[in-house]
């Protein structure tokens, strides 16, 4: 994405990517909120907050959220019915009013009484049985898939996801499915190695500058964004940061559920007070449209005519229902670039299966891999595909926009969050396919490096992370921490260290336990050992490296006041980047968009408002 953004500027660029910043933004803005919330963050095992997310079943584990909220009411009603049909329901479950259920206001005993019969139901059924039921009933539940289950997955098979390549029978083909007028663009996939650099022929680029060096790389690019939740908005935030004009379409009558996320009792800002919505939609304009009203759809189509690209992350049937699917729009605007990103893609038997990022992590294999070898899967949190998939979505959209600039033609880009997750685990899939190795949960350990992990330091919940990449690193580490020569020599090879990893970790932990995490990391770094203190959200906010790079940007939100926003991890040498506004209030820019872009006068705008078109 960074390289494509550099190309989009049309100017020579040095592209500077920070691994630290790129990982930071996966926290969905939590670090930027630290000055207001003072929440440093904590681990929660197989739970999210106070409720369990990963549950054991008859032959493995499934992901199911027991949290409240409008978006989960039907889900909770469905699981209650299923448990009751199995004869396991109790009054704590059947008498619960899910429309007002708030897990954060319940005692531990009350939550346990609700969770008990659900847990018993899961233990009666296999992962396959539970997932088939989920698909049939639109239950947001997913199996914690292993490689064998992914290779046999009906949805992935329908979408022709795996291909044979270079001795691997099942290799992820691509995270992207492509549709274009006349099928001019073929689906990407693995190819034979290209020629050596010395044999490559220079290729001229027809991408022209979008503006002067004072303009962002995507300046002049116009994007219309539909959708809800996190994955879509995160992807489009890249473009807003680098100069694109982004208009986000919302509805007052059915607001984005993320606007209700994390709202505590008495929140003075209501739907304008969600920290997470604010963090993910910084830099965008906001327009409210009622897409169930014909004039609302008509206005949306006019804006699509204005836009270079449309981005949406609704369930597949939603845009079809509005008449705003790619097939309908491309008939009128063949140069349209449109990207659709949902949990399992736009086609296939499971395309309409509902779920959040927690279900995506399970379906995509991440839950199976995360945790300790002798314990249940524990995550990763939060919702890894909501953090991972946007990188793929942004990259695909950038490619589509550059293709349009070069050719004048449009394209539809279909990204499945699950497929993006599996694509990221391609080595795991290939290892299973070739060697039959399923892999196990290893905590912080590595199969290739010992030691490799996080070790406790002085203070409350403080750790230092370190790794030895070769035998020389190991010898240096033993000198620093005072391991005797006999022990150091006995463990001088990787094979020996792999066999004695428990012993090694105990020795290191004994040395780190009474030491300050930062001082320990600096001591190890000075000796040439890679080590860092494990940062919490407060540490990240105060990090001098992040401050030097301007990672956090403070803007004044009209209701919440000063808010911290995070940059997306890369800089260009000859194109500025940043945010010119916080997230939009509901309908905040209606007058600007309708008047300045669509040319509607005040009288017409008032009529639209009175007739519910702008709800």
Residue ranges of model-derived segments:
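N-terminal helix-loop segment corresponding to the beta1-alpha1 unit
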Residues: 1-2, 6-7, 128, 164-165, ...
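Active-site-adjacent "lid/gating" segments in soluble enzymes
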Residues: 1-68, 72-81, 179, 183, ...
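Conserved beta-strand scaffold positions in the cores of enzyme catalytic domains, especially
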Residues: 14-16, 141, 246, 286-288, ...
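Short, hinge-like loop/turn segments at secondary-structure boundaries
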Residues: 33-34, 159-162, 263-268, 354-359, ...
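Terminal low-complexity tails and localization/encapsulation signals of metabolic enzymes
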Residues: 40-42, 56-57, 64, 95-97, ...
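Short beta-strand-initiation
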Residues: 48-50, 173, 273-275, 449-452, ...
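Aromatic-enriched alpha-helical interface/lid elements that frame and gate functional surfaces
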Residues: 51-137, 141, 451-527, 531
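Short, well-structured beta-strand/strand-turn elements
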Residues: 135-150, 246-249, 525-539, 600-605
């Amino acid at each position: 994405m960074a390289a494509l953004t550099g190309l989009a500027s049309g100017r020579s660029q040095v592209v500077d990517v920070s691994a630290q910043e790129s990982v930071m933004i996966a926290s969905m803005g939590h670090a930027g909120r630290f000055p207001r919330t003072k929440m440093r963050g904590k681990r929660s095992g197989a739970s999210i907050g106070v409720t369990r997310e990963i549950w054991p079943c008859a032959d493995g584990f499934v992901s199911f959220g027991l949290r409240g909220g409008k978006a989960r009411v039907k889900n909770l009603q469905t699981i209650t019915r299923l448990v009751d049909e199995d004869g396991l329901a109790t009054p704590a479950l059947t008498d619960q009013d899910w429309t007002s259920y708030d897990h954060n206001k319940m005692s531990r005993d009350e939550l346990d009484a609700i969770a008990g019969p659900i847990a018993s139901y899961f233990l009666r059924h296999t992962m396959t049985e539970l997932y088939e039921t989920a698909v049939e009933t639109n239950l947001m539940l997913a199996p914690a898939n292993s490689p064998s289950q992914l290779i046999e997955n009906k949805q992935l098979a329908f979408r022709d996801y795996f291909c044979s390549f270079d001795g691997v029978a099942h290799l992820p083909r691509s995270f992207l499915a492509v549709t274009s007028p006349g099928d001019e663009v073929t689906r990407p996939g693995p190819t034979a190695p290209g020629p050596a650099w010395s044999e490559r022929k220079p290729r001229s680029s027809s991408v022209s500058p979008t503006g002067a060096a004072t303009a962002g790389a995507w300046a002049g690019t116009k994007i219309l964004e539909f959708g809800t939740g996190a994955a879509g908005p995160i992807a489009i935030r890249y473009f807003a940061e680098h100069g694109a004009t982004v208009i986000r379409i919302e509805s007052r009558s059915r607001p984005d559920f993320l606007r209700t996320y994390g709202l505590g009792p008495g929140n003075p800002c209501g739907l304008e007070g969600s920290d997470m919505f604010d963090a993910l939609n910084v830099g965008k304009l906001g327009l409210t449209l009622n897409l169930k009203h014909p004039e609302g759809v008509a206005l949306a189509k006019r804006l699509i005519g204005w836009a270079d690209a449309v981005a949406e992350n609704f369930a597949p049937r939603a845009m079809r229902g509005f008449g705003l699917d790619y097939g309908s729009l491309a008939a009128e605007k063949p140069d349209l670039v449109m990207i659709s990103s949902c949990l399992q893609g736009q086609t296939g038997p499971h395309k309409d299966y509902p779920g959040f990022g927690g279900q995506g992590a399970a379906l995509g294999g991440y839950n199976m891999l995360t945790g300790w070898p002798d314990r249940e899967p524990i995550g990763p949190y939060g919702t890894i595909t909501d953090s991972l998939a946007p990188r793929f979505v942004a990259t695909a959209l950038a490619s589509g926009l550059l293709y349009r600039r070069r050719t004048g033609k449009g394209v539809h880009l279909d990204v499945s969050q699950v497929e993006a997750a599996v694509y990221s685990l391609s080595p795991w899939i290939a290892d299973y396919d070739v060697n039959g190795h399923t892999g196990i949960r290893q905590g912080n350990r590595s199969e290739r490096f010992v030691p490799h992990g996080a070790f406790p330091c002085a203070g409350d919940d403080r750790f230092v992370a370190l790794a030895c990449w070769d035998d020389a690193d190991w010898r240096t580490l033993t000198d620093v921490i005072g391991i005797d020569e006999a022990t150091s020599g006995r463990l001088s090879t990787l094979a020996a260290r792999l066999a004695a990893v428990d012993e090694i970790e105990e020795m290191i932990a004994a040395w780190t336990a009474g030491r300050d995490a930062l001082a320990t990391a600096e001591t190890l770094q000075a000796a040439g050992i890679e080590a860092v203190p494990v940062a919490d959200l407060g540490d990240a906010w105060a990090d001098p490296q992040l401050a030097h790079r301007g990672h956090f940007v403070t803007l004044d939100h009209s209701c919440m006041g000063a808010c911290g926003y995070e940059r997306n991890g890369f800089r260009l040498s000859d194109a500025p980047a940043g945010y010119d506004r916080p997230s939009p209030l509901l309908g905040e820019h209606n007058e600007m968009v309708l008047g300045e872009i669509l040319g509607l006068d005040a009288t017409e705008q008032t009529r639209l408002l009175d007739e519910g078109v702008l709800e």
